[in-house]
Design a protein with these regions (language model features):
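A conserved mid-protein helix/loop that constitutes part of the nucleotide-sugar donor-binding site
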Residues: 12, 21-36, 53-59
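Nucleotide-activated donor-binding/catalytic signature segment of Leloir-type glycosyltransferases, i.e.
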Residues: 56-75
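Short alpha-helical donor nucleotide-sugar binding micro-motif in glycosyltransferases
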Residues: 75-76, 81-85
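Short alpha-helical segment that forms part of, or immediately flanks, the ligand-binding pocket
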Residues: 79, 98, 102-106, 121-122, ...
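Aromatic "clamp/platform" in nucleotide-sugar-dependent glycosyltransferases that forms part
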Residues: 93
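Short hydrophobic beta-strand element within catalytic cores of glycosyltransferases
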Residues: 110-114, 119, 124
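A short, well-ordered alpha-helix in the C-terminal region of glycosyltransferases
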Residues: 151, 158-172, 181-184
């Protein structure tokens, strides 16, 4: 990173922001990944922001797995969560263009995503501004994602470096930037 940003005062918190729908969003994968991390990192927590048809099932899963540092916040404006969280975990099977990525990155939240759809690779550069667990036709590997997350959870310097890069990347998706791209396109057409 450029090292020109002040240190981000982030909490040791991983968030998920989105619909609680296990079919597309695969939120259960987030809990499976967290289950491998919680005891190793007792000072970290997982916060799930959003609501949907699978909320009760997911809450039951947390209870049955005896996970303690997990909270379900329901449907909320995510801004306050973006301001304080260090990492966003997204394990969807498919997405169009996940707006949550540039949105969270603009607050210096480092995205950790499952690379199961192409838009991820347009936004996140693995090891630079976030983490990508490559798609595997055998399925999502929670243990591998937990390993990738561990590196970030252990090093505030790594988190700061990637957070700064995430902020820079997010600027490409600001309204001004998108507007200028459209303007250039139209100018080239007419």
């Amino acid at each position: 990173g450029g090292g020109n940003l002040p240190p981000l005062f982030k909490q040791k918190e991983i968030i998920y922001v989105g619909r609680l729908d296990c079919n597309q969003k695969r939120v259960l994968r987030i809990l499976q990944t967290w289950a491998l991390l919680e005891q190793r990192y007792p000072d970290w927590r997982l916060t799930i922001v959003g609501d949907g048809p699978d909320r009760v099932n997911l809450e039951n899963q947390v209870f049955e797995s005896q996970l303690e540092n997990v909270s379900f916040e329901g449907f909320q404006n995510p801004r306050g969560y973006y301001e304080r969280a260090s990492i966003l975990l997204l394990t969807s099977e498919f997405e169009g263009f996940p707006l949550v990525l540039p949105e969270c990155m603009s607050f210096g939240v480092v995205p950790a995503v499952y690379g199961s759809y192409s838009a991820v690779y347009d936004i996140v550069e693995d090891g630079k501004n976030g983490l990508i667990l490559p798609y595997d036709k055998k399925g999502y590997n929670a243990a591998l994602m937990a390993e990738k997350l561990s590196v970030l959870m252990q090093s505030s310097d790594e988190r700061q470096r990637m957070a700064e890069n995430a902020i820079v990347t997010s600027r490409k998706y600001s309204l001004d930037s998108v507007y200028q791209s459209w303007e250039k396109l139209f100018d080239s057409l007419f």
